[in-house]
Structures are given as structure tokens and as C-alpha cells.
Amino acid sequence: MKGSNTSRWAIATGIIVVALAAAWYWHSHSSSNEATTQQQRPAGGGRHGMRGGSLAPVQAATAVSKSVPRYLTGLGTVTAANTVTVRSRVDGQLMAIHFQEGQQVKAGDLLAEIDPSQFKVALAQAQGQLAKDKATLANARRDLARYQQLVKTNLVSRQELDTQQSLVSEAQGTIKTDEAAVASAQLQLDWSRITAPIDGRVGLKQVDIGNQISSGDTTGIVVITQTHPIDLVFTLPENEIATVVQAQKTGQPLAVEAWDRTNKAKLSDGTLLSLDNQIDATTGTIKVKARFNNQDDALFPNQFVNARMLVATEENAVVIPTAALQMGNEGNFVWVLNSDNKVSKHLVKPGIQDSQTVVISAGLSAGDRVVTDGIDRLTEGAKVEVVDAHSATTASEKPASREHAKQGANS
């Protein structure tokens, strides 16, 4: 029994010793790893840096001084400078068409012909009547001459002379009527040849050869639209009228550009032609008309386009990317970088602006560097790292990647 107790104590003592040794070994290695980790970890960045001591990556641009044009924009519709519905001025059968649909024609070009037979007959009749009445007049004049001689010898009375004089005058009046009839018949014959009244592009024909047409037809034969030049009618807000009028007082024509619906492609260049004489009370806008040469046929009647009219040019303007301009409780501001790459907030007054750039009227000077990307990570006085677009994207993705890797390891 005694030997058995001794054996139990020996085993228990051994187990205790092994447990103590294991505990010492684990504690010493844990402390060593923690110390190593503390030595390798960089100092925290505080409010001037990001996690792990790295600087916030930003993109920057330098404010530049340049001339900036001021444009007024509006949606407009292209309209033909002149539009004419070509109609026949006489009645008859359409005998020939001398144009191709869609072709450009000049004023005076022959477009169509109506059967001239009836008009030739009418002209011949009028000319025959004129010739007859001219012969009658000649005979009356000869008789008058004889009467004038005979009245001197009292062979004819004074009354007979006066009667003959009246016959001559009557014949002269008849001649004038006949001449007018001849001119009218000639005009009807001329009108059987239908010509273009203006320069322009002909549309689709409205009637085919062989049809009977009349001067009362409202449809006409074809429509001609003058496209060289061509007009653009667009609208501007009524509060811009003073700007346009002031620009017109310089005496220089105001340039107008026509852009497509997406505002990506410029179609043509023209000049301001006129302003309407009244404001549309319903919309609070005024109509403006510009004229374009359109020799390349880039503009087409009834086409919708965006109009841009140059009214002024601001010289030596301070310009920055639009992305740098921010809005806060105090108004518009930008983040400005100093030589140490530390940022500070500057309140600014913006001017002319588009989707790419903005003019800063006050609060910034040419040569100042402004932050254009990474703005949401900035605080006053923070030091940042200026990187290009690719570097900024990579840097912003790294913290998320490390966090994802850490979560994967823990799982």
C-alpha cells in the first residue's frame, strides 16, 4: 500500500512540473511576439494621416489664368430662310416635271410644264384681233385725213369731221384693249411653264404627270425650302436680354454655334440675325434667330439643335476644374495645397461654369493648387499625398483589401 501511494505522488508531481513548464514556454513566446509586433507597427497617423500612418491620397490641379468665353445657350429649331409652295397659276393638264426630288434649284429654273395648247390658241386669237383692229384704225385715220382737207372747201361739214375724229379715237382705244389681251394671253402661256421662285431644295412632288391641276390647288406641285442660308430659332430667358443687347452695341456680329442634341458635336457656325420684339409671357423667354451659311448641309429644316451664342470674353480669368469646387454651410469653397502639401479651406466666388471648368472670380489666384479628388478625406491642416488618378484609386482600395484579408484570416 505504501509503495502504491509513493507512486501516485510521483506521477502527480510530474504532471505539475510538465504543466508549469508548458505555461512558462507559452508566456515567454507570447510576450516576444507582442514586442516584435509593436516594434514593426508604424506610429499612428492621428488626424493628419490615415490608418497605419499613411497620408491621404488626393489628386490636384493648378489654377490657370486664361481668356474664357461666355456663352448663352438654348434649345432651338432649324427653319428654312424661305419656304415656298410652288403652285400653278393656270389651269390645265400637267405635261412634264423637270426636277429631281431633293435637288437644289436656282430661282428661274424650270420645274414643270402644263399643256400649253389652249394658251397658244388664246394668244393667236388675241393677236388676230389686234391685227384686225390695227387695220381698222389705219383706215379711220386715212378717212380723217381726207375729211380734214374737204372741210376746208366745205365739201364735208364740221360735224362729219368730228364724227370721223371720234372713230379714230375709238379705234385707238380698241387697239389698247387688244394689246392688253395679247399680253394676257402671252402671260397665260408663260405661266404654263412653272419655274422656281427662289433658290432652295425641292421636296417630294405632290402631283404626278397627267393630272389636271388648277390655280386653286392648295397642295401645290412641290415645296421649296431655302437652306443656303438657313436659320435657327432658339429661346433665351428674359433676364438675358440685356446681355444680348449690350453685346450687340459693340457693332460686331455675335457668333452662334449649332450643336447636336447630345451637345457633343458642333454642326455649324453662324451669326445672330435678330431678336423677337416681345417676350413670351407664358414661358418668360424671348425668341432669337441666327443665320448659318450651311453650304455643307449640316443643318436641316425642323431639326432640333442646341444653340450657343458668344456674348462676351472674360480676360485673365482664374480657372480650375469644376470637380474642385465644393459647397458648404458658408458657401462655395476649395481645398488649397501649400508647398508642404497641407490643405486649407478657401472660400471662393464662382463665375462662368460648365461641366469641365469654372471661373473663380474671388478667393483664388493663378498658380494655386487645388484638390480635385479625395476631398471627402480632408480636414483643415491635414497633410496629404498628391497622386495621379491611377495611384489614387489603388491607394483607396488598399485599406479595404487589408480589412477583407484580416476578416478571412479570422474566419
From Swiss-Prot:
Pfam families: HlyD_D23 (PF16576). Residues 1-21 form the signal peptide. The keyword Transport applies. It comes from Enterobacter sp. (strain 638). The gene is mdtA. Part of a tripartite efflux system composed of MdtA, MdtB and MdtC. InterPro entries: CusB_D23, Multidrug-R_MdtA, RND_pump_MFP. One of its GO terms (molecular function) is efflux transmembrane transporter activity. GO terms for cellular component: efflux pump complex; plasma membrane. Residues 33-58, 389-411 are annotated as: Disordered. It comes from the Bacteria. This is Multidrug resistance protein MdtA. Gene3D superfamilies: 2.40.30.170, 2.40.420.20, 2.40.50.100, Helix hairpin bin (1.10.287.470). Keywords: Cell inner membrane, Cell membrane, Membrane, Signal, Transport. It is a peripheral membrane protein. It is found in: Cell inner membrane. Residues 399-411 have a biased composition (Basic and acidic residues). Belongs to the membrane fusion protein (MFP) (TC 8.A.1) family.
